[in-house]
């Protein structure tokens, strides 16, 4: 019922409305998370984030291309380690998966071409940026869309889907577009809920965070760390993880998560396809 028409006889004027979200490229609610470069040299294996290459507040495409070329000819570069998670499994503070199930979601991906390699670099940048700005996020997404237009394969589609979803999550969580000037990809729901809870009262946070964001399956423990025996693999290979502390890398502090990443990196069997 239109209350304006009921009391005045004048119908309410209809204004055209733009959709707030766009249709996802990849139909399944799964995203590529915790993307880190893997480099190995003799008895040392390192998983680390890609450097955030910014110029004048936006993504520096020329530096990114130079970095991709370096990785293509590198003798130590093995690929990118990553985990595929559903929206409902990424609880921000923890991962709602049993360790043996999570282990099946983690793998090392060796991109077969420069397009997919650059998409992985952009994914790692997006998760490991210390300070997010709308200009940087939008420039990174624009570059990812351009890469996909050059190589529209299913793996590029999935990586672009993940970048779009993570970018929308960042814009929503850090309130970079309060006016909602343009439709965007749907973001991760648990991060939107986390931001709403963090903005509430102390009492509400104490009540709601354990309900929605804590799981005893793979929880993050900032005090947990590997000892020297755990850092060294069976073949005497030392493994280290380096990443930027952001809300998207909190899972890497969990000992069970780091252990799975270590196992996958030391296996030495990267795959050349994300989706088969």
UniProtKB/Swiss-Prot annotation:
<dbReference type="Pfam" id="PF01677">
    <property type="entry name" value="Herpes_UL7"/>
</dbReference>
<keyword id="KW-0946">Virion</keyword>
<keyword id="KW-1035">Host cytoplasm</keyword>
<dbReference type="GO" id="GO:0019033">
    <property type="term" value="C:viral tegument"/>
</dbReference>
<dbReference type="InterPro" id="IPR002600">
    <property type="entry name" value="Herpes_UL7"/>
</dbReference>
<comment type="function">
    <text>Plays a critical role in cytoplasmic virus egress. Participates in the final step of tegumentation and envelope acquisition within the host cytoplasm.</text>
</comment>
<protein>
    <recommendedName>
        <fullName>Cytoplasmic envelopment protein 1</fullName>
    </recommendedName>
</protein>
<keyword id="KW-1040">Host Golgi apparatus</keyword>
<dbReference type="GO" id="GO:0044177">
    <property type="term" value="C:host cell Golgi apparatus"/>
</dbReference>
<comment type="similarity">
    <text>Belongs to the herpesviridae cytoplasmic envelopment protein 1 family.</text>
</comment>
<keyword id="KW-0920">Virion tegument</keyword>
């Amino acid at each position: 019922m239109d209350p304006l028409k009921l009391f005045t006889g004048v119908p309410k004027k209809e204004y055209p409305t733009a959709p707030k979200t766009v249709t996802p490229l990849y139909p399944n609610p799964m995203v590529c998370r915790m993307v880190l470069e893997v480099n190995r040299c003799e008895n040392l294996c390192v998983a680390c984030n890609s450097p955030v290459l910014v110029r004048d507040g936006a993504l520096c495409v020329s530096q990114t291309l130079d970095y991709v070329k370096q990785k293509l000819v590198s003798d130590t570069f093995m690929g990118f380690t990553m985990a595929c998670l559903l929206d409902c499994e990424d609880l921000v503070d923890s991962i709602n998966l049993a360790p043996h199930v999570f282990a099946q979601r983690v793998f090392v991906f060796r991109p077969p071409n420069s397009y997919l390699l650059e998409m992985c670099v952009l994914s790692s940048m997006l998760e490991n940026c210390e300070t997010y700005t709308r200009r940087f996020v939008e420039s990174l997404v624009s570059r990812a869309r351009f890469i996909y237009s050059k190589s529209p394969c299913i793996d590029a589609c999935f990586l672009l889907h993940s970048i779009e979803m993570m970018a929308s999550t960042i814009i929503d969580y850090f309130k970079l577009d309060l006016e909602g000037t343009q439709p965007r990809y749907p973001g991760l729901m648990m991060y939107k809920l986390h931001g709403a809870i963090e903005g509430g009262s102390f009492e509400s946070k104490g009540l709601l965070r354990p309900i929605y964001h804590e799981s005893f399956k793979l929880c993050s423990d900032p005090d947990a760390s590997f000892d020297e025996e755990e850092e060294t693999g069976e073949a005497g290979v030392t493994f280290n993880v380096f990443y930027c502390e952001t809300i998207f890398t909190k899972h890497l502090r969990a000992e069970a998560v780091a252990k799975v990443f270590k196992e996958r990196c030391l296996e030495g069997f990267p795959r050349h396809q994300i989706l088969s």
